[in-house]
Regions:
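Basic amphipathic alpha-helical segments that dock to polyanions
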Residues: 51-58
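N-terminal helix-turn-helix DNA-binding core of bacterial DNA-binding proteins
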Residues: 7-50
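Short, Lys/Arg-enriched N-terminal segment that forms or immediately precedes the first helix
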Residues: 1-6
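Short beta-strand "wing" residues that participate in macromolecule-binding interfaces
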Residues: 66
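Amphipathic alpha-helical dimerization/coiled-coil segments
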Residues: 87-117
Length: 117
């Protein structure tokens, strides 16, 4: 994890996608990926394979739905929306990550032991 860009921990991409759809409404895969990149300040960069694998997984779990539509550039695209089950999962996952972040903040704030002579 020493790269300049962030490596995603298991489950974080799902949470990012669910939050993006909850905040922005229906979006196509490219739009979801770009929004995550923008909000992260380009710390998280997503390739097509990564985002579409996550979208398939979330759809299989019933957390998002998809329907075909037309994008801003008049191309056929699949648009994704968060479902009721997805909103419930988002609430649970967000609470978990907030607890974890709080624990990590406390751990990182712990003073280092001074070396003993």
């Amino acid at each position: 994890m020493g790269d300049s860009k962030l490596d995603l921990l298991q489950g974080t991409l799902d949470l990012m996608v669910l939050q993006t759809l909850a905040a922005m409404g229906s979006l196509h895969g490219y739009g979801i990926a770009r929004r995550i990149e923008q909000v992260s300040g380009d710390e998280v960069l997503l390739n097509q394979g990564t985002i579409y694998a996550a979208l398939v997984r979330l759809q299989q779990r019933g957390w998002i739905s998809a329907e075909w539509g037309t994008s801003d550039n008049n191309r056929k695209a699949k648009f994704y929306s968060i479902t009721k089950r997805g909103r419930k999962q988002l609430t649970e996952d967000a609470a978990y990550w907030q607890r974890l972040a709080s624990v990590m903040d406390r751990m990182l704030a712990m003073p280092e032991e001074e070396s003993k002579p």
